[in-house]
């Protein structure tokens, strides 16, 4: 699933289909290359985010969460949020690699699969950090043993 597809989806509880809010954004844990939290808008209890562990399922029509998740349970386990979409992308050597256009993630595990940038695709496993200035990725390893070399 893509971040752009998840944005705006209703977030509902599993047991009684109560609407908790809408997906405003997804928080990335760059160290683990996973979605760490679902940022909410329009939540009646003013919950700002729910940890990914509270998510039961992500589909094309809604995000389903455990029914007993509360604001207090969620906030302690949610890392600082930095918007990933639109973020500048730099390698660990400072080489620019465009901006993040979208991100593919596994809707079950939350694992980041691919960053789609203005200059091409980057494997999620290469993500090293995400801050207010940029997303930092590992540079691609240099090719060795090129054709024609000894």
Identify the role of each PLM range.
Residues 1-150:
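Peripheral interaction segments used for macromolecular assembly
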